[in-house]
Amino acid sequence: MAERSQTAPEAGNDTGNEDAIGGNVNKYIVLPNGYSGQPKKGHLTFDACFESGNLGRVEQVSDFEYDLFIRPDTCNPRFRVWFNFTVENVKELQRVIFNIVNFSKTKSLYRDGMAPMVKSTSRPKWQRLPPKNVYYYRCPDHRKNYVMSFAFCFDREDDIYQFAYCYPYTYTRFQHYLDSLQKKNMDYFFREQLGQSVQQRQLDLLTITSPENLREGSEKKVIFITGRVHPGETPSSFVCQGIIDFLVSQHPIARVLREHLVFKIAPMLNPDGVYLGNYRCSLMGFDLNRHWLDPSPWAHPTLHGVKQLIIKMYNDPKTSLEFYIDIHAHSTMMNGFMYGNIFEDEERFQRQSIFPKLLCQNAEDFSYTSTSFNRDAVKAGTGRRFLGGLLDHSSYCYTLEVSFYSYIIGGTTAAVPYTEEAYMKLGRNVARTFLDYYRLNSLVEKIAVPMPRLRSKEERRLGWEHPSCLRAEQPLEVLGIPMCSGKALNEHLGNDIQWHLDCGSSTLPLGLISCSPSSSASWNDMAMSNSILLPDHSFH
């Protein structure tokens, strides 16, 4: 049994002594000062000793307020963003305030309405806390660093509640997902182990294509996709799963893509960091996305393996490595968007804008306005920058970013929070966009059957989305309270804050609006422009 910790050195947002946080809390029981008996209901028990868990320390401020300290990434105290922990031994209708006090970033989507995720044992579907109960502010009690506080009311004594920065996606979940695909024995889906992490976790490489494209001597057009190099960026895995789900489906577009293209996907480049609950780094404290120039086989083995494979394909005269897309999540911006490279060749520079513009037309949550092309020095060593300099003029390298929080549909100002399904839908739209890019539309068989209003779960997950089939969480009816500081939270807590997990799974259909490119030059404009030529992607 562990008693409440004594005051320890505080951590600033950019620097700070994190020596007091050596690991995750393990069934940590918070007892009142001077209490020596057995724990009672309401003496909260915190735990983060599970896969992808993160909570380093808990300090009780008052009877109902707790300061929570994120455990820094292993071997690197600079990064403290991801949290994922459970709370149990609660009392019915017990109200609390949790303060996350040691974020390493000052800018955050919490300023724009983002809220932590929550679920419980009796309600296992993740939900966002109501934004009215979440506050992001400078706190004088913590060196004027930014603190995120949220108010919560526990409603079931027997439940274990779990809170997280965003939807978790663990290494084990990923392995189960790939195992389920492998059991289907699809002749166009190939899974191999490209290498192992420092802690001997598997680095999976997926190949999705028609078997004819893998015959020795055949020419190949390769699309290479990677994800989860930053372990706390969990939306990356949902987007990647959406790409995979669509490509292995029987959708006519997926069949055409498999016949003409070879998709190589390494969905989890940092399995150790994912398992440990790090935000940005590997087990040894390295930001792998800054080590593409010279990855070490012992310190960065997963990155080393992927780089060696890409170089091997680049040197193969029968292989045309046409795209490299690295999937990330962004903690301060809305929507999906891309980063691309700057080239001296003006025509090549213009050509690389084609794919993002097509994706904007296919995905309502993708913003071409937020897409940028740069040669930023701080991005040196990233996959996009390194491979953009290595590969020839026919190859394009992008970083695909997606918001941790929400997207804004064109023509509106309302933020639509992302769900797991919405992230996967973006992945499906990324895959579908290759059909437009390679001008393979005429090969897709026309289906004249009307789209039904209600379809099976599998069809909703893999198929084209009809407006009535796009679904989102029903807004929860909650009572909010105003505040600007931790002390104000205490004053306003009272009886007005009561938020309980939604007992049902009701959903509200939303209309689907076609996305138009945000820039002045649409795909059709570009096609008719004298300053840019449509890419010639002939298949012989």
From Swiss-Prot:
Binding site for Zn(2+): 230, 233, 328
Main location: cytoplasm
UniProt entry keywords in alphabetical sequence: Carboxypeptidase, Cell projection, Cytoplasm, Cytoskeleton, Golgi apparatus, Hydrolase, Metal-binding, Metalloprotease, Protease, Zinc
Residues covered by the Peptidase M14 domain: 167-438
Signal peptide annotation: none
Gene Ontology cellular component annotations, sorted alphabetically: axon cytoplasm; centriole; ciliary basal body; cytosol; Golgi apparatus
Cross-referenced InterPro entries: Cytosolic_carboxypeptidase, Pepdidase_M14_N, Peptidase_M14
Tissue: Widely expressed. Expressed abundantly in testis, pituitary and brain and to a lower extent in eye, stomach, adrenal and kidney. In brain, expressed at low level in cerebellum as compared to cortex.
Known role: Metallocarboxypeptidase that mediates protein deglutamylation of tubulin and non-tubulin target proteins. Catalyzes the removal of polyglutamate side chains present on the gamma-carboxyl group of glutamate residues within the C-terminal tail of tubulin protein. Specifically cleaves tubulin long-side-chains, while it is not able to remove the branching point glutamate. Also catalyzes the removal of polyglutamate residues from the carboxy-terminus of non-tubulin proteins such as MYLK.
Matching PANTHER family: CYTOSOLIC CARBOXYPEPTIDASE, CYTOSOLIC CARBOXYPEPTIDASE 6
Subunit text: Interacts with MYLK.
Protein name per Swiss-Prot or TrEMBL: Cytosolic carboxypeptidase 6
